[in-house]
């Protein structure tokens, strides 16, 4: 419920800043009953937001660098939006186990950026491992930012 409220509030804010977003080929997105992993290049902090909007009413979890949780208010906000912290310097097994459990046992899907950051072109292998262990599909996504 709170996730839905936050998504609506953020959609209103982004609409007032950037105008109406246009989504194409949303018919390719799996049904609401199926969990999956959305993957895309990570260019801006808007990325997971627009990806979640394109697939509503589906709810998601997101990996986010642990430093984003240092600010208590912002950390609370993104946690309520489905983010969970990842230590990119010393990743633990929970970075893989947590999303696998969520994908298997809840109605939430996962949004991931295989490069791991906005400033990297290297593709990490976590997406394939999580998808294989959770037995879910990987859905590649691309987008153009508002102009």
Which positions does each model-derived feature cover?
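Soluble catalytic domains of membrane acyltransferases
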Residues: 20-147
